[in-house]
């Protein structure tokens, strides 16, 4: 997430003023907290679909950020047409929205009594025979990057994760709460 969500236009002033920074952090916390609260009361599939829809909308509204996403996609995929890049940018924003909407539902997604998470082991994992021994799992960020840790835990391993904390420490604590 950005340093500020709602106050990005005045981030330079906020960088100079601890009071302004805290006010913007608080506004961001309230905004994201309300969104996550709505997503938490919805069924998982609905929350994810709504998050994807909102992600697409916000992607169009956040023009400067969308230009940045499009520029990165153009660099990574130089053979794609501008129309294809636009479509991919929309997909990037939809995925980001879906991931955000799934945060307050991670406990339901990971719950083995529900059918949200299917684990399929294609080849034998030698470390599976000794889950108390250290092993490194690597997962691609194809959709919700929090789900592989839940799958690993369901296999009997105790995952330890690395992440970069958010610039807003209050928002960071909220996201960590949902990750736990």
Where are these regions (language model features)?
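Membrane-anchoring hydrophobic helices of lipid-metabolizing enzymes
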Residues: 2-139, 172-178
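Catalytic core of membrane glycerolipid acyltransferases/transacylases, capturing the structured
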Residues: 98, 131-180
């Amino acid at each position: 997430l950005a340093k500020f969500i709602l106050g990005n236009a005045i981030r330079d002033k906020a960088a100079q003023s601890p009071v302004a920074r805290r006010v913007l952090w608080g506004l961001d916390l309230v905004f994201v907290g309300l969104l996550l609260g709505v997503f938490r009361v919805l069924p998982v599939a609905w929350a994810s679909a709504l998050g994807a829809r909102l992600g697409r909308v916000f992607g169009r509204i956040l023009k400067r950020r969308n230009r940045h996403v499009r520029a990165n996609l153009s660099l990574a995929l130089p053979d794609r047409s501008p129309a294809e890049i636009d479509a991919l940018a929309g997909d990037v924003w939809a995925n980001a929205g879906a991931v955000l909407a799934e945060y307050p539902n991670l406990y339901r997604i990971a719950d083995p009594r529900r059918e949200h998470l299917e684990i399929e082991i294609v080849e034998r994992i030698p470390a599976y025979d000794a889950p108390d021994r250290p092993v490194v799992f690597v997962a691609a960020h194809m959709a919700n990057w929090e789900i592989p840790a839940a799958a690993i835990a369901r296999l009997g391993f105790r995952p330890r994760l690395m992440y970069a904390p958010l610039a807003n420490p209050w928002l960071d604590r909220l996201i960590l709460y949902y990750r736990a």
